């Protein structure tokens, strides 16, 4: 049965969307990596091998793995989807009317696989064999990008997030990631896996300009029992939280949203870099950031039209306990001394992916934290991450659950 539903963070994971690192990462250089939101350049072939190990580990846990390149390629085989995506990604406003028309025409003659590779991986002017009467190509240098690469597509968690019976197609904060959402819009609209089955679109499905209403999936934890935990990081705004909450309440998909105000810095760019859900009553936390006194609000529905009540609460931990109906939470902090804990948090020790209650996937390099998880009764399925970890994202960042059981 094809079921598009994510009922928790810790129930049995059944289907997940990944994106294998390929062409886009070959375009990362020391001079452009920061603009493209990376701290370093990766050895792409080695990163691909590590990613394959991640995907295979998921498969050993009876998780169906969908790959973004495959889904987008299959979507582009549908003429209506291909035309929409070319018009959206190669717009007159982005390229100028003459060059946009010429470029769309050239790209439309490519086969589905090649077009997918360029849309995800980027295209330089030196690779574009096109005579144009437009100003733009005449003014650019050969190594300038016609189509910017999207290396952050590696982190499928952020671009869209499935919350109970629907999906949010997230308006991304950073320009380097904003085009990613259109690929997911096309896939969720036209690909047979999604087009043939009903689900709710909460947010981001249309062509609106969302201004300051940004939200990214790394900040959204579907903790279960009708509750959603959202971090207001440097990439998720209060406006984004309220818009998603309003849609969840309007559609009767959630009864409460807990919103935590996070420090706005790189080491905790998303909530899941400092806090993840590992078992019904167990969380991994980096205590240097996730202090007990972080400002926290609880949003609950007022009526059934999306209106809400907003109240500040004294403790996010107590709010989570109430939402889950547990007496107290079991908190596992990052391992090692203060130096080791800071290093391991930076290398995504807290960013684990739970595949079933008490079983998580994480990088093998985080030995101190993994040892603490093991002693606390959490089974860690380790994967290599010396290259993938350079992207500042762990197993949770690199995965978008499509189907997961509740608790």
Swiss-Prot record:
CC terms in the record's Gene Ontology section: cytoplasm
InterPro entries in UniProt: Arg_deiminase
User: In the record, what terms sit under GO molecular function?
Assistant: arginine deiminase activity
- Enzyme Commission (EC) number: 3.5.3.6
| The keyword Hydrolase is annotated on this UniProt entry | yes
Specify the superkingdom: Bacteria
| Keyword Aminoacyl-tRNA synthetase on entry | no
Q: Cite a single Pfam family from the UniProt record.
A: ADI
**Catalytic residues of the enzyme:** 397 (amidino-cysteine intermediate)
Q: Which UniProt keywords apply?
A: Arginine metabolism, Cytoplasm, Hydrolase
**GO BP annotation list:** arginine catabolic process to ornithine; arginine deiminase pathway
Pathway assigned to this chain's UniProt record: Amino-acid degradation; L-arginine degradation via ADI pathway; carbamoyl phosphate from L-arginine: step 1/2
Q: Where in the cell is it found?
A: Cytoplasm
Q: What class of enzyme is it?
A: hydrolase
**Reaction it catalyzes:** L-arginine + H2O = L-citrulline + NH4(+)
Query: Which NCBIfam families does its entry note?
Result: arcA, PRK01388.1
Q: Which family does it belong to?
A: Belongs to the arginine deiminase family.
| Protein's name according to its UniProt entry | Arginine deiminase
Which species is this UniProt entry from?
A: Vibrio cholerae serotype O1 (strain ATCC 39315 / El Tor Inaba N16961)
Q: Cite the source lineage.
A: Bacteria, Pseudomonadati, Pseudomonadota, Gammaproteobacteria, Vibrionales
